[in-house]
From Swiss-Prot:
GO BP terms in the entry: regulation of DNA-templated transcription
UniProt keyword annotation of Transmembrane present: no
GO terms for cellular component: cytosol
UniProt-listed Gene3D superfamilies: 1.10.10.200, 3.30.70.980
PANTHER family: TRANSCRIPTIONAL REGULATORY PROTEIN YEBC-RELATED, TRANSLATIONAL ACTIVATOR OF CYTOCHROME C OXIDASE 1
One family name in Pfam for this protein: TACO1_YebC_N
Top-level taxon of origin: Bacteria
Gene Ontology molecular function, alphabetical: DNA binding
Keyword set includes Repeat: no
Similarity comment: Belongs to the TACO1 family.
UniProt-recorded name of the protein: Probable transcriptional regulatory protein PERMA_0079
Locations listed in the record: Cytoplasm
């Protein structure tokens, strides 16, 4: 298994997030608010907001919560102003970690993220220390039980995608240039392709293999602690781990 935010891990992630629905709502609301602030409150003309709203609906977030978050972003309602901050650091065995945050207090978040790294055997680095080990991509997941590989590949390339990865048992992973994600998604939907998830992500270009249970346990505790922080939106890392070991330490 490669990387903590790789799609192979979606079942583990879903179970974890279902158990923390309130925290998940908080993170999605922040994303909606920031998206609306940056690109306006109309999802028709704001692809980032459109994706965030779709995520909220899939999580069964009440419509009024979504509408309030949009209005806070556009300034129609008073609300907290969030800043996007990215942290970079290292975990056990030199695993590279990127942490994307939305925060109303950068100093607080920096202190908390630094503490989590230190507590779990990692260390917070400087900006740029590991980001060169990742590529930013758009990723679209399409369920494998609905379509054959040839159909998905053909539709994806026609829609403007770069590639289709077929390693996962449940999903085809369609990759795009970051700026093309929303266009490719819309083109696929026009062709009747069902999409499980569409998101901007960071994909590791080099990986660190983790084989022993002790290191794997430390690493997963670090990554989980980061994700459990309210200010953290996404965590990326470049580890490789067998499915068996992942299940054992998750």
């Amino acid at each position: 298994m490669a990387g903590h935010s790789k799609w192979h891990n979606i079942r583990h992630k879903k179970a974890k997030m279902d158990a923390k629905r309130g925290q998940m709502f908080t993170k999605i609301i922040r994303e909606i608010t920031v998206a609306a602030r940056q690109g306006g409150g109309d999802p028709e003309f704001n692809p980032r907001l459109r994706i965030a709203i779709e995520k909220a609906k899939k999580a069964n977030m009440p419509v009024e919560n979504i509408e309030r978050a949009i209005k806070r972003g556009t300034g129609e309602l008073e609300g907290v102003s969030y800043e996007e901050v990215v942290y970079e650091g290292y975990g056990p065995e030199g695993v590279a970690i990127i942490v994307e945050c939305l925060t109303d207090n950068r100093n607080r978040t920096t202190g908390e993220v630094r503490h989590i790294f230190t507590k779990h055997g990692g260390n917070l680095g400087s900006s740029g220390c590991v980001s060169f080990l990742f590529e930013e991509k758009g990723v679209i997941l399409v369920p494998k039980d609905k379509y054959d590989e040839e159909t998905v590949f053909e539709k994806a390339i026609e829609a403007g995608a770069e590639d289709v990865i077929t390693d996962d048992e449940e999903f085809y992973e369609i990759r795009t240039e970051p700026k093309e994600l929303y266009t490719v998604k819309e083109n696929l939907e026009k062709e009747g392709i069902e999409i499980e998830k569409a998101e901007l992500t960071r994909i590791p270009t080099t990986t660190v293999e983790i084989n022993d249970e002790e290191t794997a346990t430390k690493l997963m505790k670090l990554l989980d602690a980061l994700e459990d922080n309210d200010d953290v939106q996404k965590v990326y890392s470049n580890f490789e781990m067998s499915q068996q070991l992942m299940e054992k330490v998750s």
